Amino acid sequence: MKKTANKVVLIGAGSVGTSFLYAAINQGIAEHYVLIDAFPQPAEGNALDLSDTLAVIPHSFTSIKAGSYEDCKDADVVVITAGRPQKPGETRLEMVAGNAEIMKNIATEVKKSGFDGITVIASNPVDVITHVYQKVTGFDPHKVIGSGTTLDSARLRRLVGQKLNVKPESVQAYVAGEHGDSSVAIWSQANIMGRPILDYVKCGCLTLEDLDQIQKDTVDMAYKIINLKRATFYGIGACLTKIVNAVLRDEKSTLMVGAQLNGEYKNKDLYTGVPAIIGSNGWERIIEWDLTKEEQEKFDKSCETLHKTIDSVKHLFE
């Protein structure tokens, strides 16, 4: 029987997961939501709390409940945010051992449920964790999406907009590679309403030092937020909503997600942040830009860093 309503299952009902759910509910992207968590009581409490919005945000959704992995079977999208949170001063890659084990267990349960939809993952270190999930499940790589550098790119756009006093929505600027310290700002592709960002350097509105500082601030933003409030969740929650909405609406939007490289950008056998077209089939195609020599070298180094981390957890899926 043909389904007439979208169903989204969230695995990991902590701050990131519930921030995603609240944003998704406000935008009305799905009809049915299910929360799964290792601690059932908070999941049930969050489901009840969010259900109270039905009276305030009409037509936003039909049902929300705490559930189990069996609920994944007929879901359109499974969103995974489960894992240990990042500590102050800790890099994302330093979280890999524990969170990779957690993801292996989740992946096993999701596959066992008979799920055949699209998976969107934000658990850190997201590039490596997405790779682990795909290897353990054996799912079509196109149907497994990492949050990639969507948040990094959003931060970059905001910082460029602040520097030039323009709305961030008018800025097209992108971060590729690892969602982490080795990420790369792709300035050669950045523009403001079609005008290349490097033109602003030529006319004196920006300096190359400004661009370097903006990239550094983009990388450091997570550490700053974690030091101030122990976790980041609103920004990534909004980014997850954008990705899931693109899947459910078959938008064919180009987003900086974690997609599996198979020779694109001269790298392969890993997930990392690249521009990809997102629709009902997952990430449908990677867009390949002509990177500068410096950008390509930095991207290669970022991929090398990820490969080394992947090697440390290969025993989980080989």
UniProtKB/Swiss-Prot annotation:
GO biological process, one term: lactate metabolic process
Reactions that this protein is recorded to catalyse: (S)-lactate + NAD(+) = pyruvate + NADH + H(+)
Residues annotated as binding substrate: Q86, R92, N124, P125, V126, D127, D152, S153, A154, R155, T232
GO molecular function, one term: L-lactate dehydrogenase activity
Residues involved in NAD(+) binding: V16, D37, Y69, A122, S123, N124, S147
CC terms in the record's Gene Ontology section: cytoplasm
Localization in the cell: Cytoplasm
Cytoplasm listed as a keyword: yes
Gene3D superfamilies: Lactate dehydrogenase/glycoside hydrolase, family 4, C-terminal, NAD(P)-binding Rossmann-like Domain
Pfam families: Ldh_1_C, Ldh_1_N
Domain of life (superkingdom): Bacteria
InterPro entries: L-lactate/malate_DH, L-lactate_DH, L-lactate_DH_AS, Lactate/malate_DH_C, Lactate/malate_DH_N, Lactate_DH/Glyco_Ohase_4_C, NAD(P)-bd_dom_sf
Residue numbers annotated as active site: H179
PANTHER family: L-2-HYDROXYCARBOXYLATE DEHYDROGENASE (NAD(P)(+)), L-LACTATE DEHYDROGENASE
Function field: Catalyzes the conversion of lactate to pyruvate.
Family the UniProt entry places it in: Belongs to the LDH/MDH superfamily. LDH family.
Stated name of the protein: L-lactate dehydrogenase
Lineage: Bacteria, Bacillati, Mycoplasmatota, Mollicutes, Mycoplasmataceae
Gene: ldh
